[in-house]
Regions:
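N-terminal Rossmann-like NAD(P)+-binding domain of SDR-like oxidoreductases, especially those catalyzing
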Residues: 1-124
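NAD(P)-dependent short-chain dehydrogenase/reductase
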Residues: 79-81, 103-169
């Protein structure tokens, strides 16, 4: 795991040089759609320009790169499962930023011969996922219940939504 602020091109380049990776799984992002409405510029800088900074830092390497886009690029799906060829119809600044990152990743693969794959999963989760997301919130609440810190009642939002969730560990 390599830490660097994607908004800092020098830090990204130094992190790549120091790690000298053979494989890169790029999951770093401002990933909360609600935040993208209040901070669209930060979302675009982190997700689009940050992805470009990372790809540019990796351009001379031979690393295999996996860029995690999002099913949010499709907007409200007309069919389930969503075919990969479905047109983009982003419904939030977050989704627009993922379209931009997706297209820039494909551009770097084609223009520079980089080995880049892009996936558009529904939800990625793991130990560093914020508790504004359902699965992280549930886990945190369960841990607090087990520790006797809160009453055994789990607060939740819409339980009708269905998601594909991939653990990134």
């Amino acid at each position: 795991l390599v830490y660097a602020d994607l908004r800092d091109g020098i830090a990204v380049r130094e992190a790549v040089e120091q790690a000298n990776p053979t494989h890169v799984f790029h999951l770093a992002a401002q990933s909360y759609p609600k935040t993208s409405f209040t901070s669209p510029l930060d979302t675009l800088d982190t997700n689009v320009q940050g992805t470009v900074r990372l790809l540019d830092a990796l351009r001379k390497s031979d690393a295999e790169i996996h860029v995690c886009s999002s099913s949010e690029v499709y907007g409200r799906a007309k069919t389930i499962p969503i075919p990969e060829e479905a047109p983009f119809h982003p419904a939030s600044p977050y989704a627009v930023s993922k379209v931009g990152a997706d297209l820039m990743a494909r551009h770097y693969a084609e223009a520079y011969g980089m080995r880049v794959q892009v996936t558009r999963m529904g939800t990625h989760t793991g130990p560093r996922r914020g508790d504004v997301f359902a699965e992280s919130s549930f886990a945190k609440q369960i841990a607090m219940i087990e520790a006797g810190q809160i009453r055994p009642i789990i607060k939740h939002g819409n339980l009708e939504s269905m998601r594909t969730i991939a653990d990134v560990r």
